[in-house]
Amino acid sequence: DIMHALLSEGVIAQQGDYIRLKYDIFEDICFEHYFDKAFDLCKGKYKTFYDEIENLGRCVYRRYQIWISNKMFIQVNRDKFLYSLTFSDEIPQSWKRQTEIGIVKSRFCDNYFEEQGSEILEQGMLFDFVKNINLFAFEGELLHIRQESPQMKLSPIGNGRPCIIRLLKNEEIYKKNIIERDDIVKLCLDYAKQEDKVAVIASDACAMMEYYVEYSLQESEQENYYKIIDEISSCLEALYRMADNSEEWLKKFFNTLINNYINGNRKSMRKSEDIV
């Protein structure tokens, strides 16, 4: 129903029988019109656009990200604003990053990545998106714990993370770019911590984590195996958190470790013991 939708999207807050707007929508509309007008007036001279909006001061970055996120809903807006602001060589790198942050923090960026996924790959920008998700696609909550210093809890947000996971898996980029393994593992581990996981995305993330564990095990046959613990611990944590999608693989994995511990050589025994 409408009330549930507004609550789930964070538009309203409820207290007992009363509801209120969670933020000033009129303020958002004013900024939306301001950015739209500045963009139209620049007529493709993007430096003019950014020089204009920078007059807002430091608040401009979050407002710009929100403006970008709001362009996700309609294809006309995605074509008019997001294509040029993502791919044009005339965009300053600092602002291109803000554009990417606005995209990945949006809950509605699925269509964008479906439409522009191939272009992102061709332009070599995929891991720019991965790094920005890993750094910025979070929501902070300050926790006050009795007689202790306040702590910040970071929760993954936005739909950029699952969209990129699908792209990495479908194009098998996780196999081709082993050098980027740490960033991909963090991406999947953060997704595993989300409450609103989707089975097909979780399955893709698990497949990549399983591949990296098996890859590290093969590597350890030729190299000093002690580093394998650091390499696979985050992968295994992600798999534990998504056990509904990795249960059979985990059973097989630990059965293999047990067998190696019982029947293997000294190196296999020590490696299996350390992993367990």
Describe every region a protein language model picked out.
Residues 1, 24-27, 91-93:
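General structural signal for secondary-structure boundaries
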Residues 13-48:
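Short capping/hinge segments at domain boundaries that bridge a core fold to an adjacent linker or tail
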Residues 15, 39-276:
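Extended amphipathic alpha-helical scaffold segments
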